[in-house]
């Protein structure tokens, strides 16, 4: 069985063309409420890297094909001992993957503690907003959850009122990070993670309030 905490990742093991062994890490996007048994599917998101070895691996994989993986690993998870008033979830690209798996836990936190949640998701265009339908649907059902797509290039023809034109690090300031209430999660592009971490520190948040995971695309 694969029993994981939302926010954790697995590692896929494979070899380069010359036989050298390597691995890639992928956060689990699966929404689950039990340990996953044989035959049950898990969801991961794989970035397309032109010429990338992992990209070639998955492109050549047939339905029903097998890969070798290990895990789960990682501590980029919601802490049951948190007593904050608001979560700031910030992501670019496939960095939004762990937040999808966290949705049931966030729903519980909102119901039990009245916590507020803001999700800032960065992408270049609407078509690159991974899992956006899930987040919009969740926002409609949970008034304490605000979903803010941040699009750096192309805007939709009829943008939702919460759509921001620009980068997530630019949109962050509008939500006035508050060290008295906030815990922030940063996941995705390393430059974004660093920029947002510095902005949060400048706002007064301490290191324990800033939880981060950087995604680096490799060939």
Regions found by a protein language model. Name each.
Residues 1-65, 152-153:
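Ferredoxin-reductase
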Residues 7, 95, 189:
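Short, conserved phosphate/pyrophosphate- and ester-handling motifs at nucleotide-, phospho-/glycolipid
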Residues 72-82:
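A short, basic/flexible loop-to-alpha-helix module at the beginning of a structural domain
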Residues 80-85, 178-181:
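Short helix-loop-beta connector
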Residues 86-90, 185:
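Conserved beta-strand elements of the Class I
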Residues 98-110:
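Histidine-anchored nucleotide/phosphate-binding helix
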Residues 117-219:
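Reductase modules of NAD(P)H-dependent flavoproteins
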């Amino acid at each position: 069985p694969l029993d994981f905490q939302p926010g954790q990742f697995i590692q896929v093991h494979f070899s380069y063309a010359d036989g050298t062994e390597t691995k890639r890490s992928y956060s689990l996007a699966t929404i689950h409420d039990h340990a996953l048994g044989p035959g049950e599917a898990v969801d991961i998101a794989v970035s397309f890297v032109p010429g990338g070895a992992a990209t070639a691996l998955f492109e050549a994989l047939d339905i029903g094909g097998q890969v070798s993986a290990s895990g789960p690993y990682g501590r980029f998870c919601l802490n049951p001992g948190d007593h904050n008033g608001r979560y700031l979830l910030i992501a670019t690209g496939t960095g939004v993957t762990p937040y999808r798996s966290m949705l049931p836990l966030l729903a519980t936190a909102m119901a039990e503690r009245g916590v507020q949640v803001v999700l800032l998701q960065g992408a270049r265009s609407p078509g690159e907003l991974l899992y956006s339908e899930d987040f919009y649907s969740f926002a409609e059902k949970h008034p304490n959850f605000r979903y803010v797509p941040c699009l750096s290039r192309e805007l939709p023809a009829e943008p939702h009122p919460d759509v921001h034109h620009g980068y997530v690090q630019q949109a962050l300031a509008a939500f006035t990070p508050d060290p008295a209430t906030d815990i922030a999660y940063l996941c995705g592009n390393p430059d974004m993670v660093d920029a947002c971490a510095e902005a949060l520190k400048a706002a007064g948040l301490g290191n324990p309030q800033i939880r981060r995971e950087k995604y680096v695309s490799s060939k």
